[in-house]
């Protein structure tokens, strides 16, 4: 994974997954449900972060996930697989 510094003299263009090739979001697995909830609590406090949704069941559970965007606009998903 390589992250590049953006040229701030040009306006940012929102990503459209239907018309552009690129990163839609990055999913990261957490080990336990408690870690997911603790991560959500920490993320809520970060300046500039937009939470798309708090931890919620995924496909009827027991898996849970949350989605948020970091200040640069990259969407991140944290997922607990329902085991451990």
Where are these regions (language model features)?
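A short acidic/small-residue loop/turn micro-motif
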Residues: 59, 82-84
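Short linear functional motifs in flexible/disordered or boundary regions
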Residues: 15, 38-39, 84
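Conserved short beta-strand elements that form part of the metal-binding/catalytic scaffold
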Residues: 1-20, 69, 75-80
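Vicinal oxygen chelate
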Residues: 8, 21, 26-72
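Short beta-strand segments enriched in hydrophobic/aromatic residues
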Residues: 30, 80-82
């Amino acid at each position: 994974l390589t992250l590049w510094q953006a040229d701030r003299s040009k306006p940012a263009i929102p990503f459209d997954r239907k018309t552009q090739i690129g990163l839609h979001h990055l999913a990261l697995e957490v080990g336990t449900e408690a870690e997911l909830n603790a991560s959500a609590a920490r993320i809520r406090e970060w300046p500039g972060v937009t939470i798309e949704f708090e931890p919620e069941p995924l496909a009827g559970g027991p898996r849970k996930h949350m989605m948020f965007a970091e200040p640069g606009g990259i969407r991140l998903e944290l997922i607990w697989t329902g085991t451990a």
